[in-house]
Amino acid sequence: MKSIMRSCLGLFVLLTVITGVLYPVFVTGLAKTFFPSKASGSIVYQGDQAIGSELIGQNFTDAKYFWGRPSATGPQPYNGTASGGSNQGPLNPALVDAVKGRIEALQNADSTNQLPIPMDLVTASASGLDPEISPQAAQYQASRVAKARKMSLDNVNQLIAANTQDRQWGIFGEPRVNVLKLNLALDGN
């Protein structure tokens, strides 16, 4: 009995060291060697200062910026420690009220816009941290951003097109626009 327990304990310690220490250190080392930016969280820098991540949305609220998807992370938008969906069903009165409020806010921000409001501007993603919107969501906001920045709508549309990523390998996912990168392109213009 003691020899069996000793063998089990030894195997437990060995596998803990292999899978809990050696393997993660090895994989992290490989990632930092071959994909240093990705392994560090895809941080976006402006000069020497980190201003965000390509992978986590930010709470842009100024009219001169494109707005991302609503965050489902509670009172602090885009809080990575509170990541998760709202878990509200489509008939949940709280979700219906939240969507109506978001629609009203978008209409108030650009009352002359007659385009249909894309779904991703009024509903949160599964993680609540999505950094990207659809090209349609960017197009919907283009007139508001152009007016706020006193830019031509054509220039704003060119920036949207330049920052639109196609499907991965032509088949996976949907075309998308990273909101942080698009807003940085606007600031650089």
From Swiss-Prot:
**Coiled-coil ranges (or none):** none
Cross-referenced InterPro entries, in alphabetical order?
Answer: KdpC (IPR003820)
* Keyword annotations of the record: ATP-binding, Cell inner membrane, Cell membrane, Ion transport, Membrane, Nucleotide-binding, Potassium, Potassium transport, Transmembrane, Transmembrane helix, Transport
Q: Which GO terms describe its molecular function?
A: ATP binding; P-type potassium transmembrane transporter activity
Pfam families tied to this protein? KdpC
Task: Give the way it sits in the membrane.
Answer: Single-pass membrane protein
User: How is this protein annotated for GO cellular component?
Assistant: plasma membrane
Is Transmembrane among the key words of this record?
yes
**UniProt keyword Cell membrane present:** yes
| Compartments it resides in | Cell inner membrane
| Transmembrane intervals | 11-31
Return the similarity comment. Answer: Belongs to the KdpC family.
Q: How does it assemble?
A: The system is composed of three essential subunits: KdpA, KdpB and KdpC.
Q: Which HAMAP family match?
A: KdpC
What does this protein's UniProt record list under function?
Part of the high-affinity ATP-driven potassium transport (or Kdp) system, which catalyzes the hydrolysis of ATP coupled with the electrogenic transport of potassium into the cytoplasm. This subunit acts as a catalytic chaperone that increases the ATP-binding affinity of the ATP-hydrolyzing subunit KdpB by the formation of a transient KdpB/KdpC/ATP ternary complex.
Q: What is this protein called?
A: Potassium-transporting ATPase KdpC subunit
What is the organism field in this record? Polynucleobacter asymbioticus (strain DSM 18221 / CIP 109841 / QLW-P1DMWA-1)
What gene is this protein a product of?
kdpC
